[in-house]
């Protein structure tokens, strides 16, 4: 599905490397996709434990959709030079709407609880095995003029620099809203791995209906 536009928000540029993240209370692997890149490495990106909890909007506006997002994204690199892999891991949505009444769509995303596990952010062996949950970025907002008609908006809600043969990032109860869209709103979560060489692979989950 072709997106009308794509917005990338870099949130954790200071993190040099991420390693495998811990689980959540939801069910396991949701989807994955692999790609053999130009250096004969197999790049795999996965989504785990995805859960979007749609709630009644606090503004009580029938054109507002509000939800809380929990889940994980993981990547695995196999093949020659896998340990030297460097790139970016993204999480985001494709947002589908049937009608916008000419007022556009506003997307806001706050991240009260991003978890990063086993991140070697200084020098080994410091054993950072505990979960780190700082308020790395309190909120971002994206607006797009969609006109009178259906459409799709793709938004990368956050992006982290990664290195090494495997790693991941998890988010718990991150908050999102879409306003100004009449009718139901569909959210299709995705995870994308982009190598420093430019190769990329994206896995898309099932759509979630935010009625």
UniProtKB/Swiss-Prot annotation:
Does this entry carry the keyword Magnesium?
A: no
Instruction: Spell out the subcellular localization from the entry.
Output: Cell outer membrane; Secreted, Cell wall
Q: Which InterPro entries would you find in this protein's record? A: Leukocidin/porin_MspA_sf (IPR036435), Porin_fam_mycobact-type (IPR015286)
Q: For this UniProt entry, which segments traverse the membrane?
A: none
The observed outcome of changing residue 96 to R is: Increases yield of ordered crystals
Q: Which domain of life is it from?
A: Bacteria
Q: What upregulates it?
A: Constitutively expressed.
- Where primarily located? membrane
A cellular-component GO term for this protein: cell outer membrane
Keyword Metal-binding: yes or no?
A: no
UniProtKB keywords = Cell outer membrane, Cell wall, Ion transport, Iron, Iron transport, Membrane, Porin, Secreted, Signal, Transmembrane, Transmembrane beta strand, Transport
Provide a Gene Ontology MF annotation, just one: porin activity
- Consequence of gene loss (knockout): Single deletion has decreased permeability to the antibiotic cephaloridine (9-fold), glucose (4-fold), serine, phosphate and iron Fe(3+). Growth rates are wild-type, due to the other Msp-type porins. A double mspA-mspC deletion takes up less cephaloridine, glucose, serine and phosphate than the single mspA deletion and grows slower than wt or single mspA deletion. A triple mspA-mspC-mspD deletion grows even slower and has reduced Fe(3+) transport compared to wild-type.
Q: Which region is the signal sequence? A: 1-27
| BP GO annotations | iron ion transport
Q: How does it assemble?
A: Forms very stable octamers. Isolated as a 100 kDa complex that can be reduced to monomers upon boiling in 80% dimethyl sulfoxide for 15 minutes. Structures show a goblet with the wide end on the exterior of the outer membrane and a central channel. It is not known if mixed oligomers of MspA with other Msp subunits form in vivo.
Role summary: The major porin in this organism, forms a water-filled channel which favors the permeation of cations, amino acids, iron Fe(3+) and less efficiently phosphate. Does not transport Fe-ExoMS, the predominant siderophore. Plays a role in transport of beta-lactamase and hydrophilic fluoroquinolone antibiotics such as norfloxacin as well as chloramphenicol. There are about 2400 porins in wild-type, 800 in an mspA deletion and 150 in a double mspA-mspC deletion.
Q: What is known of its domains?
A: The rim domain (28-96 and 152-211) is accessible from the external milieu and is partially embedded in the outer membrane. The stem domain (131-148) is inaccessible from the outside and embedded in the outer membrane, while loop 6 (121-127) is thought to be in the periplasm.
Spell out the family assignment given in the record's similarity comment: Belongs to the mycobacterial porin (TC 1.B.24) family.
Q: Know the name of this protein?
A: Porin MspA
Instruction: Name the source organism.
Output: Mycolicibacterium smegmatis (strain ATCC 700084 / mc(2)155)
Gene name per UniProt: mspA
